[in-house]
Amino acid sequence: MSVPVYLAKLAVKNPSDHRLAKIKRLCDAVGLADKVKPLGTVGEDEVVAIKLHFGEAGNDTYLHPTFVRQVVDCVKATGARPFLTDTCTLYKSTRHNAVDHLETAYRHGFTPYVVDAPVIMADGVTSKCYEEVAVNLKHFASVKIAQAFLSANAMVVLSHFKGHAMGGFGGAIKNLAMGCAPQAGKIDQHGRNVVIYPKCIGCGQCVPLCPRN
């Protein structure tokens, strides 16, 4: 199924044609307001999850908070109440738990004062807040989804393109599939490690490399 793709060029030809204004026009072009509250199911005081990647410490290629603010404003214009969200990483990093993840997000500018919306970790403090959802698909009969996504009335997904050590690159699909899963769901997607006993010499070198100890 094909869908329209809208492109906003980075070049600014006049002061009123700045990038923030272009993001607002993109929101209008895709009909964000109608998509946030389809068939009237989402309205005043309902919550909308804005899923994005807050960036790892030391990186600067995440979406700029002032860009995200424009999307927040568009969602708020519908009467809904947005919040920014993501999940804990499986690997040990500055986003491995909600405390470190929030501090990283704040350092990168994703504060309520800038984005005008709260930041809530979707899978709880230690990635234990999730539900098993039946899907009955090829690879999984059920999948683990972070609780905040299931509690929201609607979701807006903001993705940025980036390199990935294992997959080559990551974008919108990974932002949803891996990004909406708690650590337990990420383990399921990566596949479980299996000890090849005839080759294992019990050296223990694999233990410190395991993100889940």
Identify the function of each model-found stretch.
Residues 1-213:
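N-terminal and secondary-structure boundary signal
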